[in-house]
Amino acid sequence: MSEEKVFPMTAEGRDKLQAELEDLITRQRPEITNRIQIARSYGDLSENSEYQSAKDEQAFVEGRILTLKKMIENAEIIDPNATAADVVSLGKTVTFKELPDEEPETYAIVGSTESDPLAGKISNESAMAVALLDKKVGDKVSVPLPSGESIDVEILKVEK
């Protein structure tokens, strides 16, 4: 018997997935169904690009709906209060600097479904997060890089 994959995420992340799911079901799915019906009215489906395009989009949307349902159903909501205030954990925001003297950087550590490095959210599965998790303010950690080298960082601040 296979175990379902658990998707760790914040309550905010789950809410965003739920909103996307609702949009797909209530807005996008009916729009695509309508486009398919209109395209069918054009006759021969074998050379009907509007029909093929709508069917392709329908397949994508239905697949995304199934994926979102599974992710929401198997969501493990992260409680940043479950660990000490100064300990890095999922759902917390950590400020660190690369040693010896780089500028501080701040990222929230979130589940992989929510990661968006450009928005300051890194996946708990990333090398940086793995190195920082369960460490405390003042700790210095080594973060492996894809090149095989590593960088040293110091944790400056942890926030919920």
UniProtKB/Swiss-Prot annotation:
GO biological process, one term: regulation of DNA-templated transcription elongation
Listed Pfam families: GreA_GreB, GreA_GreB_N
GO molecular function: DNA binding; RNA polymerase binding
InterPro entries documented for this protein: GreA/GreB_C_sf (IPR036953), TF_GreA/GreB_CS (IPR018151), Tscrpt_elong_fac_GreA (IPR006359), Tscrpt_elong_fac_GreA/B (IPR028624), Tscrpt_elong_fac_GreA/B_C (IPR001437), Tscrpt_elong_fac_GreA/B_fam (IPR023459), Tscrpt_elong_fac_GreA/B_N (IPR022691), Tscrpt_elong_fac_GreA/B_N_sf (IPR036805)
Record-linked SUPFAM superfamilies: FKBP-like, GreA transcript cleavage protein, N-terminal domain
Sorted UniProt keywords: DNA-binding, Transcription, Transcription regulation
Source superkingdom: Bacteria
Function: Necessary for efficient RNA polymerase transcription elongation past template-encoded arresting sites. The arresting sites in DNA have the property of trapping a certain fraction of elongating RNA polymerases that pass through, resulting in locked ternary complexes. Cleavage of the nascent transcript by cleavage factors such as GreA or GreB allows the resumption of elongation from the new 3'terminus. GreA releases sequences of 2 to 3 nucleotides.
Family stated for the protein in its record: Belongs to the GreA/GreB family.
Name of the featured protein: Transcription elongation factor GreA
Gene source species: Leuconostoc citreum (strain KM20)
Gene: greA
